[in-house]
Amino acid sequence: MNGRHVGLAVIVAAVWGVNFVAIDGGLSHYPPLLFTALRFLVAAVPAVFLVGRPGVPWRYVLAGGLVLGALQFGLLFEGMKAGMPPGLSSLVQQGQAVFTAVFAAALLRERIGRRRLAGLAVAVAGMAVAALDQASRGGSAPLGAFALVVGAAAAFGFSNIITRRAAPPDALRWMVWVSAVPPLPLALLSVLTEGPRADLEALTTFSPGAVGSLLYVAWGATLLGFGLWGRLLRSHDASVVAPFSLLVPVFGMSSAWLLRGEALTWLSGAAAVLVISGIAIASLRRAPAATAAAPGWRADADADGRAGRDGGGPARRPLPPYAAGAAGSPVRPS
């Protein structure tokens, strides 16, 4: 990877890390479910009319939109609104790699090797330390908020499996279409649970900071982030690109400290070291043998069982970042 692409990968990680601070800012104005609905609405329109069809069966678009959009981000926004700090949230969301491995083993019959299992155990220990850190901040509400964000990480992991089964050919187009699914059900759920008066007040009261947060999470983290990430995956193997996502909680925690005054305790620092190093152990692999398909590429076999360009089958095409994540690389942002 050349210097320019390294810079782009770091920029994407920074955009996704700071996204948690933007979410925290938007939640000071919008009710969480309404904010989630608006985030996906702004990301989907008008982009959905410009990017072309998703290139996957519609059932996967619907499932991805409901699990990733409504469930994952609904839980994340509710947890942060309930008191989960943005920096710690960015770290706990990396637990999606653990849930992805569990779901892949249970649903796809993937084998978890000893090295990967050890790394995931270290990451789980880091999440336990993060829970202690959240508990030390006081009260039962923060622990409940922590549970919501862990639930969001679990939904992240399940959506990885959906995306892997869908195998969309373009990451940005996939995200735009998935974003078109959650706005309506989330808006209805917001009216029912958060109340029409709170929603109407948030929509009719102008706040430059809230609007800026909304545009950042919709256009910056979703459209710009996935557009650049997909470009990098088209140029490099997923095993080269995916490790840069380990920088997301680094940028998330540091930006929360700088911009929101979130305390960095020794517990949160220990949790960060354990989670990031555990996911790195589980995800970073040795270079494959010369005869093997490169990581991040799917070798589609032809009728004779031959695969890839050299075998006479169809040319390999890069997996999108979510599908690569299902194989164990921590590539999911928020």
Which stretches of residues belong to each language-model region?
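Specific alpha-helical transmembrane segments that line the substrate/conduction pathway
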Residues: 34-45, 77-111, 116, 120, ...
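Hydrophobic transmembrane alpha-helices of multi-pass small-molecule transport proteins
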Residues: 41, 47, 103, 112-134, ...
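Hydrophobic/aromatic residues within transmembrane alpha-helices
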Residues: 26, 35, 79, 106-108, ...
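Glycine-/small-residue-enriched transmembrane alpha-helix faces in small-molecule transporters
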Residues: 1-34, 135-165, 184-188, 293-301, ...
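Specific transmembrane alpha-helical segments of multi-pass solute transporters/efflux pumps
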Residues: 14-20, 48-93, 101-103, 129, ...
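Membrane-interface helix-cap regions at the ends of transmembrane helices
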Residues: 18-25, 29, 42-57, 124-140, ...
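Membrane-interface capping segments at transmembrane-helix boundaries
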Residues: 234, 283-296
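Hydrophobic alpha-helical transmembrane segments of multi-pass integral membrane proteins
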Residues: 4, 31-48, 63, 119-125, ...
